[in-house]
């Protein structure tokens, strides 16, 4: 279904919630209007924008690092230094382990998630129109953090780090004891402890990923609803206030994802 064939607000909303998908069995693009896609599909628009935004982050910060001066810094260098100082201060306050990798990790998470969230402010029809009419693509979504696959993948990476630091600091035996002998320190309660600690451990990445996805999906959906239900000449009455408020949400969600990552890794690095 092309934009020209969309005749109702429901079709418009559904069209903008479809990802550009690749069928991994046939390596062909999936037509979102042919029915539900199979499990073996890849949301290549989410992957593309995630990688591009990550490369932009690396390029910009590398440029600042190479051109940094000890004199009066420029505006962009000042902004980067403020971000680095803010993230470094947050890590110092919340992380009590010895690893020196947490601050760079926190900086990467904060800026990368912020850039992905920032794509929500791109006009809702701009890039999809270009993709459809100039490139012949059936669909396009430009907000990677509104794709649950992206947010849960990032959360899975954090979860792997939690396991790594837990085993590194406590040893395999200490990690197993933590799962089986807490909160009830008696062998008879090992099954209960394992269930409680297992649920607690698994809930960290799940809640981390779903929280970011839910907030960004809701924000994207509101922009789509405004564009799909209101005439073009009145959309700015709601779009502008929501966009201004959404800037706060974009920044806050990146900050929350970073803070929870730091806290979880700090807990994992504690020696018992």
Swiss-Prot record:
Superkingdom in the source lineage: Bacteria
BP-aspect Gene Ontology terms: proton motive force-driven plasma membrane ATP synthesis
Transmembrane segments: 41-61, 102-122, 147-167, 212-232, 243-263
A single GO molecular function term of this UniProt record: proton-transporting ATP synthase activity, rotational mechanism
Oligomeric form and interacting partners: F-type ATPases have 2 components, CF(1) - the catalytic core - and CF(0) - the membrane proton channel. CF(1) has five subunits: alpha(3), beta(3), gamma(1), delta(1), epsilon(1). CF(0) has three main subunits: a(1), b(2) and c(9-12). The alpha and beta chains form an alternating ring which encloses part of the gamma chain. CF(1) is attached to CF(0) by a central stalk formed by the gamma and epsilon chains, while a peripheral stalk is formed by the delta and b chains.
Family according to the record: Belongs to the ATPase A chain family.
Protein name per UniProt: ATP synthase subunit a
